[in-house]
Amino acid sequence: MKKFKYVIGVDEAGRGPLAGPVVAVGVMIHLKSQISNLKTTTQNSKLNKMFKELKIKDSKQLSLKRREEIFKLLKKHPRILWAKGMVSAKVIDKINIWEATKLAMKRSIKNLEKKIGKKFPKKKTLLIIDGNLKIDSGFIEQPIIKADQKISECILASIFAKVIRDRLMERYDKIYPKYNFKKHKGYPTKEHKRLITKYGACKIHRRSFKGVGGKRLSG
């Protein structure tokens, strides 16, 4: 495999819900404490050992409590650099969920560049994307099915994105308490669909999604 100066893993949370944003996180793991000497690998033995000890795996296989624990433990780890990108329900309705997912991922990379204070060189940066989606980022892209179970950067991106989105939906629950967003996080559960039918859609519902479109706007 070609050697890259930077390896970034990207994953998203919130592609399937009927409400709320789609959230993407880009993660880069570096072996040096100084960015100027940055060298990245998905085969970092120390981090792999830490992943094993912490029993870190794909966010979908972890409980909410465990995801929160891992996020709190690793969000400020000196070797883990990350940034988020979000796209609102309103924009999702305008451009569709696939384009919104790509946009969220691109925003996460741009925000990661801002965070470290430098641009990633296009030909020396490998972007590993969970799934089979290409996002036209300009970087060398490698979509990998189930990367969120195999690639350290994508595993972390998956966990971080899920935690960030869950927290956001819990905040929305306080603004729109009758929809119980805290429980289902906007996903199309029977309860959520029933509440949409009863109260209509609120401002963070995705009007272009089946089960929401055509429902009166509440509030």
Language model features with spans:
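Conserved positions within tandem-repeat grammars
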Residues: 36-38
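Ala/Thr-enriched low-complexity intrinsically disordered regions
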Residues: 40-42
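RNase H-like, Mg2+-dependent phosphodiesterase core
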Residues: 1-34, 45-219
